[in-house]
Amino acid sequence: MRPIDDSSLTWDDGALVTVDQRGLPHEARPLRLRTADQIIDAIKTLAIRGAPAIGIAGAFAVVLATRAHTRDGIVDVAAVRAEADRIAAARPTAVNLAWAVDRVRPRIAEGADAVLAETLDMLAEDGRVNRAAATHAADLVQRLCGPRPLRVLTHCNTGRLATSAFGTAIGALRVLAERGAVEEVLVDETRPLLQGARLTTWELAEAGIPHRLTIDSAAAWAMATGLVDCVLVGADRVTARGDVANKIGTYAVALAAHRHGIPFVVVAPESTRDPATASWRDIVVEERAAEEVTAFAGSATAPVGTAAFNPAFDVTPADLVTAVVTEHGVVHGTVAAEPGARIAATARELYARGWMPGTAGNLSVRTGDTAVVTASGLAKGELSATDMVRVAIADSTPLPGQDRRPSAETTIHTAVYRATGAAAVVHVHSPFATALATRAGAADEVRVLRITDYELIKGLGGSDPTAIDLAIFPNWRDVPRIAADIERRLAEHPGAPPVLCIAGHGITTWGENLTQARDRAECLEAVCELVLRTGREHAFAPQTHVLEMGPT
């Protein structure tokens, strides 16, 4: 039996080497896959399965496709891209497959070695990411359930077979077991393909974690009779609002956990989160062959010709999920994420849009008479929940005993908090709003631009849904001076909209929570883009005089 820390996917002499999961637990058949078609077939037939694992396997398939379409050192880029599309479509529900293929696409023109280097980096990252997510999840479970040996129910398979190393939900079980905090794991068999019975029990036995197997339909009764303290599962896709697509049967487990007040915790890498998918209704749920239901171990269990409903996945609504935990900590769930986790997740989203390039920009959340704000000098695309500073709203000073330091722009946040009832502030450098502010602003005075008759104005939080007076502040080198200007104007104009611009600098928005503040930043950027794209020029006046700008 292989050591559990071994990777389930390796690259050897031009081939992807793995174990055929269809043979487990009785036979660990090695697979040596040398073509993209072989990998696609392995993914479709579940020889390779698990969202992170099929993502990495898909990237290796692009490596092999690039090799196959290279002649005399020249890559047929169009042919490889077409192959990449086919690879990404092999299983539609798990977002990791398309994510991994998209990650290596930009390297195709550089040749197979470049695609391979990116894929090997991804493979190395997977173990680190899984271990981090598993540790965060174990910490959360112990916080929710207490420091005692726990009885945990899990569904499907989420170990190194489903990833490449360590595992997600099984990884969390391993961390808990290392802490002496596992009494027993109850494993759903996971019909119809028995990933729990065949794979999870095999991995738990390998790790020496005590467990029992149960039929899927007994999970709710196990909860009702007090045999379960917590549920830990993985995910194939997490929507923008926190809905979770996972192996069929997960939704039923979540419903039972909700009914009995048992924490339902999802453990998955960030690559499983899909901000482009708004809700569960947008997820394509794969349906598989009827024979998986109408037969068992090769023998028919239903009359010939019996029709079957055989979805491979279901989607658990966000309100049934206690927490979605990634390598960055809690990012979704009914359990309130710590401010740092929420801020870090939002910062990564805004970084991906190009609004917080490098170390620029900052976000904050009010916590009583203090605020939690992103620390200075850190790349916003890599923030974690601990990359924050708590400051006093009264004077912007950091509370003692912290390693991180706040940036000078923290004074803008605290100025907004002192002058308004805001609970969160977003300060970013979105391009269209910054460009408009640069054109409209002045070096030494606040200017106001009236924008009218754009539908998105209603998303800016002003009192008039058809018009907004957008204040544009001068960009003083001394940032506290900008903050003083902002606080003074907000005090003088208590009905001012919760958005503003700083010439040549960026935008600041605020709201009742971080989501609302972020949404207002999105709407402001969109409105400013519309204004600029109309191509109309105006002279801009100081704050005592307002000029109008609206659609012609």
From Swiss-Prot:
Residues 334-535 are annotated as: Methylthioribulose-1-phosphate dehydratase activity. In the N-terminal section; belongs to the eIF-2B alpha/beta/delta subunits family. MtnA subfamily. In the C-terminal section; belongs to the aldolase class II family. MtnB subfamily. GO terms for biological process: L-methionine salvage from methylthioadenosine. Pfam families: Aldolase_II (PF00596), IF-2B (PF01008). Bifunctional protein that catalyzes the interconversion of methylthioribose-1-phosphate (MTR-1-P) into methylthioribulose-1-phosphate (MTRu-1-P), and the dehydration of methylthioribulose-1-phosphate (MTRu-1-P) into 2,3-diketo-5-methylthiopentyl-1-phosphate (DK-MTP-1-P). One of its GO terms (cellular component) is cytoplasm. Signal peptide: none annotated. Coiled coil: none annotated. The lineage of its organism: Bacteria, Bacillati, Actinomycetota, Actinomycetes, Mycobacteriales. This is Probable bifunctional methylthioribose-1-phosphate isomerase/methylthioribulose-1-phosphate dehydratase. It catalyses: 5-(methylsulfanyl)-alpha-D-ribose 1-phosphate = 5-(methylsulfanyl)-D-ribulose 1-phosphate; 5-(methylsulfanyl)-D-ribulose 1-phosphate = 5-methylsulfanyl-2,3-dioxopentyl phosphate + H2O. The gene is mtnAB. GO terms for molecular function: methylthioribulose 1-phosphate dehydratase activity; S-methyl-5-thioribose-1-phosphate isomerase activity; zinc ion binding. The active site is at residue 236. The record marks 156 as: Transition state stabilizer. Its cofactor is Zn(2+). The keyword Lyase applies. Zn(2+) binds at residues 427, 429. SMART domains: Aldolase_II (SM01007). It comes from Nocardia farcinica (strain IFM 10152). Residues 1-333 are annotated as: Methylthioribose-1-phosphate isomerase activity. Substrate binds at residues 49-51, 91, 195, 246-247. Keywords: Amino-acid biosynthesis, Isomerase, Lyase, Metal-binding, Methionine biosynthesis, Multifunctional enzyme, Zinc. Pathway: Amino-acid biosynthesis; L-methionine biosynthesis via salvage pathway; L-methionine from S-methyl-5-thio-alpha-D-ribose 1-phosphate: step 1/6; Amino-acid biosynthesis; L-methionine biosynthesis via salvage pathway; L-methionine from S-methyl-5-thio-alpha-D-ribose 1-phosphate: step 2/6. Its EC number is 5.3.1.23, 4.2.1.109. HAMAP family: Salvage_MtnA, Salvage_MtnB. Binds 1 zinc ion per subunit.
